[in-house]
Amino acid sequence: MGRVALLLALCGCLGTARRPISPSAHPVLVYVANQASGKVTVIDASSDSVVTIVDFTSLGFSAHPKPHHIVVEPDGSYWYVSLVGDNAVVKLDRANHVVAKAETVTPGLLALDPKSDLLYATRSMSAVNAPARIAMINRKAMTVEEVEVLVPRPHGLAVAPDGQHAYIGSLGANQIAVYDAKREQVGIVEVPGGDTSQVIVGLDVSPDGKTLVATAQLTGKLLVFDLADPAKPKLVQRVATGDWPWLVTFTPDGAEVWVPNQRSNDVTVVDARRWRVVTTVKGDFAQPDGIAISGDGRLVFVANHNTDNVMNMGGISMAMPLPGSTAAPGRVIVIDARRHEVVRRVDTAPDGSGLGVGGGKP
């Protein structure tokens, strides 16, 4: 299947002791999307302190831009955020200046292609009638190509380490779309599960490219797929998690998989060799959502909505502050990845959703 090129050229704290991170000319920064408040909170990972809060309305965007998810260039030179309310993916530099934007309808999750200049974007969970397409954005020119992926409500997203395949999970069907970047073709994989809707929220691929994992919100499972044939993921394991498993990530060494559970307010840690639960991290979680791990694998950062309100979006439930209400601060929980212990809480602007990490080496 050929690409359909649109080419839209457009431009707190609880504290047990933790080891300090050595200073860097370009420190490791954690960017936290605060969807309901239209802001992004920037945290210095060396001190777990808020460096600044980027207000997108003050940057010329709408009153309700809804920043949802963030990815960062590995060297921290640029970061990208999906603005659900403004139908745009925005590129900013290290100084938080807007460099360019790419227009695409209700963008949701983002993923960098590690082998090219491509940035993938799916659709927001809040987009009930989202197009069955993903956006492929050239990160240098910020031009867009829309690709039909043939599954309803495409949301979950992961790109293989070699950049050859992208995996897209459907919120509306038990399906995963596989985009072959070389052949420019899309295949559909049916996820076993009968007629029960699983609601695939998050995806990730192991660092060695051999395994795909997906979270199934309604069944409370981590789905494990073998990628011996990367075009045809094969379901080989189901691992019980907490309630409403959300986004998911492998550790940099591929040894563990970490899953925030939005309704049980905890994080499941899974051994990625035996596919058994190692532990469940408890702490000051409050509707956790996004998760990211520092490049050296030492620290895990989990964004939290911190709201008791649950919105129904086309049959899918998620934590989200009630529109017009006075929202409590969002929060990021910082975890020692080796000890599986919470070490710090950092309060942010209200409604923490997705987050990204980048910059110098911690």
Residue ranges: model-predicted function:
Residues R3-G12:
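Bacterial N-terminal signal peptides
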Residues C13-P362:
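Predominantly soluble domains enriched in secretory-pathway, periplasmic, or organellar proteins
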